[in-house]
Amino acid sequence: MSSSSSITTTLPLCTNKSLSSSFTTTNSSLLSKPSQLFLHGRRNQSFKVSCNANNVDKNPDAVDRRNVLLGLGGLYGAANLAPLATAAPIPPPDLKSCGTAHVKEGVDVIYSCCPPVPDDIDSVPYYKFPSMTKLRIRPPAHAADEEYVAKYQLATSRMRELDKDPFDPLGFKQQANIHCAYCNGAYKVGGKELQVHFSWLFFPFHRWYLYFYERILGSLINDPTFALPYWNWDHPKGMRIPPMFDREGSSLYDEKRNQNHRNGTIIDLGHFGKEVDTPQLQIMTNNLTLMYRQMVTNAPCPSQFFGAAYPLGSEPSPGQGTIENIPHTPVHIWTGDKPRQKNGEDMGNFYSAGLDPIFYCHHANVDRMWNEWKLIGGKRRDLTDKDWLNSEFFFYDENRNPYRVKVRDCLDSKKMGFDYAPMPTPWRNFKPIRKSSSGKVNTASIAPVSKVFPLAKLDRAISFSITRPASSRTTQEKNEQEEILTFNKISYDDRNYVRFDVFLNVDKTVNADELDKAEFAGSYTSLPHVHGSNTNHVTSLTFKLAITELLEDIGLEDEDTIAVTLVPKAGGEEVSIESVEIKLEDC
């Protein structure tokens, strides 16, 4: 039996607990919410922090004046107040009001995903990086030697042993619960649910998450140089579950994985929950094509790579970036045990994903893509919006000390003390050049976009023609503005897997299983998740595809009107789209 199989019976049905260095439970008292039990404890250790802004951050931009207005200098009390009229960065969540996480409508996570609450919650300091003598180098998982594997297994075993005290913030389940709390409706900020996916928070949140997880593992084996491995799924040699995670009885093994995808099965980076009989070579080819599209074609600018802006007061899940969309989500779906688990546990659902050790290996490679993307050049650089830079999260470090962290402090992995062992990136040179058709599709024979949208359901392949805002643009114009194919108000049931593919200059007879064609523009995917305040579970967001390079490759730069085809792969009968347009956006 796997270690994750007993989760529902070993974790207590409570909301949160004060942190004690001895982890001793004392008397209980009720929270303001009658249905929630709050267990108090006393810490023998303490920390001191000045709330003076000069001691918070030496960076002049670190203390945003709007944060002061929100009372964030005194920390969490203002997190649940109604939002101000102007935007502001997302504050750390209010741990004292952490509530029930949800699997889906009417189904709550049966254990608390909330972390223990420190006694000095209103004085939690900002994290400062400790001094270091050498970088921690994260290796590709498939190439790890047995000495490394043994060390990683030992560290994970010791982390699992800490689950004997379910309130130990360093325990494996408490670490997994971080993802559950931030992603399944347990937290609210500004009166709205906090969600760290489907927006520009995706990359920085997960980078900080792995940073502390990695340091905890290292501390448990007394090795400050220990580094997490990365699942090198963007290289053909790494396109399978790394062997170290596929050993039954190991602390790195999880029973709740798709058993059809073990023993060296090639991963499909575009997986959408259904098994497709595709030759291995074609899967690998599709994978490299997807990587090129997501890292190069569709992400020439920061906004496309990181995702939509998500300031305080805005609705959660405004729109995901290219890598979060694919391959991040399909890897979750492919690994999770959808055939045997109702909700695709473990990797196939946000609330349970952290219960599989491979989650952290997967996200290490996702994080590596952040570094690789900036190396491609052009305008691929970090965002500069202060609402992004000053957004904050809450974590415990390896010494069980609580800290606040800012996005601005995680932009350079080397400054954080880690880097990635280099591996070839063959996808960089994998631009699809082979065309499905020899000429231009007759757009006059295809219904115009105004006759197709709004679309009630994407239950079959559809084609439409659409007019571009400008044609025959100069190189300078292309450098200044990216041409964006924009799908407005895509709505669907967020409890289901969703994917559809987008093609240009082909009709609905296109072979959508072969993605290594110049006309393939990109895909939209979604992992099941829940908005706690959204009782009808309908997600509505915008999906954007950068198409400037694509139009050049297909030879459509001078065309005023182009053909677009959408091919549903999963959940299309639940997908509606209000409108589609092409816009020019500053890069």
Curated annotation (Swiss-Prot):
Q: Which UniProt keywords apply?
A: Chloroplast, Copper, Disulfide bond, Metal-binding, Oxidoreductase, Plastid, Thioether bond, Thylakoid, Transit peptide
EC number of the protein: 1.10.3.1
Residues annotated to bind Cu cation B: 328, 332, 363
In its keyword annotation, does this UniProt entry include Acetylation?
Answer: no
Q: Which cofactor does it need?
A: Cu(2+)
Cellular component GO terms held in the UniProt record = chloroplast thylakoid lumen
Principal localisation: plastid
Its UniProt entry gives the catalysed reaction(s) as: 2 catechol + O2 = 2 1,2-benzoquinone + 2 H2O
Pfam families attached here?
PPO1_DWL, PPO1_KFDV, Tyrosinase
Q: Could you tell me at which residue positions the 2'-(S-cysteinyl)-histidine (Cys-His) crosslink is annotated in this chain?
A: 183-197
Gene Ontology terms for molecular function: catechol oxidase activity; metal ion binding
Localisation: Plastid, Chloroplast thylakoid lumen
| PANTHER family membership | POLYPHENOL OXIDASE F, CHLOROPLASTIC, TYROSINASE FAMILY MEMBER
According to its UniProt entry, what is the function of this protein?
A: Catalyzes the oxidation of mono- and o-diphenols to o-diquinones.
Tell me what this protein is called. Answer: Polyphenol oxidase E, chloroplastic
- What organism is recorded for this protein? Solanum lycopersicum
Lineage from the top down?
Answer: Eukaryota, Viridiplantae, Streptophyta, Embryophyta, Tracheophyta
